[in-house]
Amino acid sequence: MANAKEIKTKIASVQNTQKITSAMEMVAASKMRKAQDRMAASRPYAENMRKVIGHVAQGSLEYKHPYLEVREAKRVGYIVVSTDRGLCGGLNVNLFKKVVADVKKQREAGAEVEFCTIGARSAQFFNSFGGQVSASASGLGDAPKLADLIGTVRVMLEAYNEGKLDRLYVVFNKFVNTMTQAPVIEQLLPLPKSEDDEFTHQWDYIYEPDPKLLLDTLLVRFVESQVYQGVVENIASEQAARMVAMKAATDNAGELIGDLQLVYNKARQAAITQELSEIVSGAAAV
């Protein structure tokens, strides 16, 4: 058994760690609330944009935009959104597992894959995973702007425009609630048709003045908005996961301190008992 001094040092060390994890929990909770506000503000726009674009994909258009044409999936691109930092539980691991499983299916079907990573963790993982990483962005902070993502997204759009990609997906952790974050893979290109059951009829649009100019701008904005929403959702998921992880670490530290305190008390008791025995033995010898 370790002596009382060593145990006391361990207790102090765990208490210091507990203070750090408790502070990180409070910081994550504050950041999560702010991230939730940003997510709630941008989610209606992203969802309605996807719905409108889904109707466009079902419509009979005067001008057939390349983003509406379904091609054989010989090369597939993934825009993978992860965190820059760790200490957020299994958030990134679960996301990467989902991507790897989907990539395996694509490769079994004979397709090649290409990645665009947003977040330092995804860049580290996919650079070692195998497959081409065409673009990367990291260090966006807790409140990124759409302008911070445009350059990275454009790399994948240009690859699609040039026929180097036949499918494009965005992958991120969708914020469900504080305890639940779900990794999702959403198709960006070719444009997915609307899954809204309310609209069973065809949507026909009249574009003024020029359908090509309008669609060229609108469809690019759609892709950018979906990626931005994925980034915002992922940030909220990151802070929620970190808050939960730090709370668990703080609670575990408390339990460990309690266990160490019991060991310390036993060590102190043993030391005192030994001292008393030595005193009694010495007195008897005299």
Curated annotation (Swiss-Prot):
Q: Does the keyword Electron transport apply?
A: no
- Look up the domain of life of the source: Bacteria
Localization: Cell inner membrane
| SUPFAM superfamilies, per the entry | ATP synthase (F1-ATPase), gamma subunit
For this UniProt record, the keywords arranged alphabetically read as follows: ATP synthesis, Cell inner membrane, Cell membrane, CF(1), Hydrogen ion transport, Ion transport, Membrane, Transport
One matching Pfam family is ATP-synt
Q: Name one GO cellular component term.
A: plasma membrane
Kindly list the biological process annotations in GO that this record carries: proton motive force-driven plasma membrane ATP synthesis
Coiled-coil region list? none
User: Which InterPro entries does the UniProt entry name for this protein?
Assistant: ATP_synth_F1_ATPase_gsu, ATP_synth_F1_gsu, ATP_synth_F1_gsu_CS
Q: Please report the record's description of how this protein sits within the membrane.
A: Peripheral membrane protein
Which residues does UniProt assign to the signal peptide?
A: none
Give one GO term, molecular function aspect: ATP binding
Job description of the protein: Produces ATP from ADP in the presence of a proton gradient across the membrane. The gamma chain is believed to be important in regulating ATPase activity and the flow of protons through the CF(0) complex.
Q: Oligomeric state and partners?
A: F-type ATPases have 2 components, CF(1) - the catalytic core - and CF(0) - the membrane proton channel. CF(1) has five subunits: alpha(3), beta(3), gamma(1), delta(1), epsilon(1). CF(0) has three main subunits: a, b and c.
| Similarity section | Belongs to the ATPase gamma chain family.
> What is this protein's name?
ATP synthase gamma chain
What is the source species? Shewanella pealeana (strain ATCC 700345 / ANG-SQ1)
Q: Which gene encodes it?
A: atpG
